[in-house]
From Swiss-Prot:
Purpose: Transports adenine nucleotides.
Subcellular location: Plastid, Chloroplast membrane
Stated name of the protein: Probable envelope ADP,ATP carrier protein, chloroplastic
Record's bilayer topology term: Multi-pass membrane protein
Keyword set, alphabetical order: Chloroplast, Membrane, Plastid, Repeat, Transit peptide, Transmembrane, Transmembrane helix, Transport
Keyword Methyltransferase among record annotations: no
Organism: Arabidopsis thaliana
The organelle targeting sequence, given as a residue range: 1-26
The Solcar repeat ranges on this chain: 85-177, 185-268, 279-359
Amino acid sequence: MEEDRAILTFHRIPSLNSSLITTSSPAKSGAEQFRRRVLRNPARGDFGLGRFACISLVEKCEQREFAPTTAQLLNNPLAILALVPKDAAIFAAGALAGAAAKTVTAPLDRIKLLMQTHGIRLGQQSAKKAIGFIEAITLIAKEEGVKGYWKGNLPQVIRVLPYSAVQLLAYESYKNLFKGKDDQLSVIGRLAAGACAGMTSTLLTYPLDVLRLRLAVEPGYRTMSQVALSMLRDEGIASFYYGLGPSLVGIAPYIAVNFCIFDLVKKSLPEEYRKKAQSSLLTAVLSAGIATLTCYPLDTVRRQMQMRGTPYKSIPEAFAGIIDRDGLIGLYRGFLPNALKTLPNSSIRLTTFDMVKRLIATSEKQLQKISDDNRNRDQAQ
C-alpha cells in the first residue's frame, strides 16, 4: 500500500444493532458513472450506503501530467528548454556568458592590471613614473608577445564560470527575498539584492581572483599550480584572501548600481522596446558605465592590497597612501582600459542573461500549450 494513501478502518461496536449498519452499494452502472464524473483524473475512491450512515471516501492523487510526446517536442524544439530546471538554465547561461565576455576582453584586463599595480611591482619611488595605456600595450608586446595579452586568462575563465553563474542566479533569488508585502521590489530592494549577489559570488571565488592577478602581473611564465604552491609556501593560506575586505566593499555597490539601473531602465521602456536585444545592450552599457565610474577607486585599492609586498593593511590606509603618492588621479589608474573592458564585458553578460530569461519564458509557454492540448484531447475522449 502506498505510504501517502488514505486508510479507513472499521471497529465493531458490540452494543450496536448490526441491522443498522448493513451497507449496500449502488448499481454498477451508477458507480461507474460516479467514477467517470467525479473521480476521473485527480482522485480515486469508493463509497457505501447504509441505514446507519452514508460514507463517501475520496482519495486525492497527483494531477496527471499530460507530458509531451517525442514527436511534439521535435515539432516544438524550444519546449525542450522548459524541461531543464529553470535555475540550472540560468546558472549555465550566466557561466557561458561570463566566460565568453572575459576571454574577449582579456587583453584590456591585463593592461589595466599592469597600470594599477605598477607602483607596487617596481617599488614606491618608481611609482612616480606611472605607466600609461599605450606604454602598457607596447611593454606586453615587447616582453611577452601576443600571447602575453591573455596571460592569466585561464584562472580568470575558471573563476568567472562559477562567479558569473552564481552572481546572476543569486540576484534573481535575492530579488524574491527582498520583495515587499505587495510582492513588489523597491529601488532599495534592488540595490540590496545586487549588493548581496555581488558579495556572495566574490566570497566564493576570491582565491581564484588573487591567483589570476599574480599570474597576470608577476614576471615570467608559471602555471596556476606553481603560483598557488608558491603563495601557500611563502605567504600562507591567508595570501589567497589578501584584499578581500575592499573587494567585498567594492563589488557590493558596483553590482548594486549596475543591476539596479539595468532593471529600472528596462522597466521604464515602452513594452515594444523591452524585448529588443538592442535595448538590452544599450541599457547594459549605460548601467555598467555609471557603476564603473562610481566604484573604480575601490577596485584600485583592492588590487594594490592583493599584491605581494603591499604596504597597506587597511582600506583607509590604502586610500591615504595612493592619494598622498599620486593624488586623486592615482585612484583612477587604468580606468580607460577598464572602461573599454567593463562596458562590453558587462553588456554581453547582462544582455545574454536577459535574452536567456525571455527564451526560458517562451519555452515554458510552449510546453504549457502542449500540455493543455493533450489534456483537452484526453477529456474529449
